[in-house]
Amino acid sequence: MTETKTLKNFIGGQWVASTSGKEEIVPNPATGEVLAKVPISSREELDAAVAAAKEAFREWRKVPVPRRARILFRYQQLLVEHWEELARLVTLENGKVYEDAYGEVQRGIECVEFAAGIPTLMMGQQLPDIATGIESGMYRYPLGVVAGITPFNFPMMVPCWMFPLAIACGNTFVLKPSERTPLLANRLAELFTEAGLPAGVLNIVHGAHEVVNGILEHKDIKAVSFVGSQPVAEYVYKTAAAYGKRVQALAGAKNHSIVMPDADLDMAVTNIINAAFGSAGERCMACSVVVAVGDIADELVERLKKAADRIQIGNGLDQGVFLGPVIRESHKERTIKYIEIGEREGALLVRDGRRDAATSGKGYFVGPTIFDHVKPGMTIWTDEIFAPVLSVVRARDLDEAIEIANRSEFANGACIYTDSAKAIRQFREEIDAGMLGVNVAVPAPMAFFPFSGYKNSFYGDLHANGRDGVEFYTRKKMVTARH
């Protein structure tokens, strides 16, 4: 029997075995097969990574911006060359189907492409005549050592939101990837090194709470980016801010899709099925609530059930599979408890994902689950379940639909299905969410726009990606000169 390998940390350009003596297994969620072991590193190992990043910053900050951009361009090329390998790795450790994983790799590559445009993005501003013989200008500079804490559900895309842009801006980076999906992070570091990134500019420390708290409290880390659940995001924001750090913490969601009576139901059903059950519902832009407006509700629910019945469940590497497993057995059990709560609180269980054949075999499978006649305030409406569970709420009109969506504590995304320009305008103006979709499945923006949730979906001032990302990873100097 082949011995399961234990992953290493990446510190100062070297792969370093952890000395903590603690580790966890990394199973394939579709089969339970152990892929690797991941170290649960110590605070001392984090300190070593920060020290390496701090030392590397002394020279990296001086590297001309066009030269940094060329390294990013080479990195982008390597990611494209290894696209299929990276997608397969995402499926193996995360469980999402290969098609979803392939798309995730594309989004990660797009983030690197955006970061490679750093010469334009880093430009400052200048006014030559603020007074007679006096000019003034604003210049951007890197912060220093910055850190990222990333989740299991997008092991390629979310790290690529963070470290390529931060490094392009002249910072050095310490990444703490999810201990559930650590394999992809290490591969990203290998390819960045191959692209010519100097030692110490990117460091990876695997771990859990001790490493997270070390990042939040470390005096030499100037900024922290986080993506994860709402309670942890709030903790990260409050703790890091208390230590004087710049923070962006992207949190949970409960995204509503409003279906109007004039909607194209074929398109709406296809999009909702993709948004609700794609990636097993484990994404912060998943559609978890449908608000059916008027007399369209019965037909919509019937069509959603029929479409869900046709979904093939299984290993994400198998041909034709649409729905893979959730990330862990504990998450499967948590999802089943939410289904039980929904029944107990009086929602109508239209499709029970617990009964799908795949749920009784190996792997952590839950089939597509649909509730109808869900009321705002029910637990399955309120909580982020983060699984293939869809709630249908009924509303009399658009006013009530928007009021229902706006009652959620979260404000990541929302969609509307309609051809009415009036309804679209009202939705755009009145809905309380950061990323809006009109007749689209998932309104997640591309890398050159900010990922802009708010309320309890976001803690901080500057969002990930786009100009917000550049602002987050740089500081400004104003220079006023007399000639």
Swiss-Prot record:
Pfam families: Aldedh. One of its GO terms (molecular function) is methylmalonate-semialdehyde dehydrogenase (acylating, NAD) activity. Its EC number is 1.2.1.27. It catalyses: 3-oxopropanoate + NAD(+) + CoA + H2O = hydrogencarbonate + acetyl-CoA + NADH + H(+); 2-methyl-3-oxopropanoate + NAD(+) + CoA + H2O = propanoyl-CoA + hydrogencarbonate + NADH + H(+). This is Malonate-semialdehyde dehydrogenase 2. GO terms for biological process: inositol catabolic process; thymine catabolic process; valine catabolic process. It is an enzyme of class 1 (oxidoreductase). Belongs to the aldehyde dehydrogenase family. IolA subfamily. The keyword Metal-binding does not apply. The keyword NAD applies. Homotetramer. Catalyzes the oxidation of malonate semialdehyde (MSA) and methylmalonate semialdehyde (MMSA) into acetyl-CoA and propanoyl-CoA, respectively. Is involved in a myo-inositol catabolic pathway. Bicarbonate, and not CO2, is the end-product of the enzymatic reaction. NAD(+) binds at residues 152, 176, 179-180, 229, 384. NCBIfam families: MMSDH. InterPro entries: Ald_DH/histidinol_DH, Ald_DH_C, Ald_DH_CS_CYS, Ald_DH_N, Aldehyde_DH_dom, MeMal-semiAld_DH, MSDH_GmP_bac. Pathway: Polyol metabolism; myo-inositol degradation into acetyl-CoA; acetyl-CoA from myo-inositol: step 7/7. The active site is at residue 284. The lineage of its organism: Bacteria, Bacillati, Bacillota, Bacilli, Bacillales. PROSITE patterns: ALDEHYDE_DEHYDR_CYS. Keywords: NAD, Oxidoreductase.
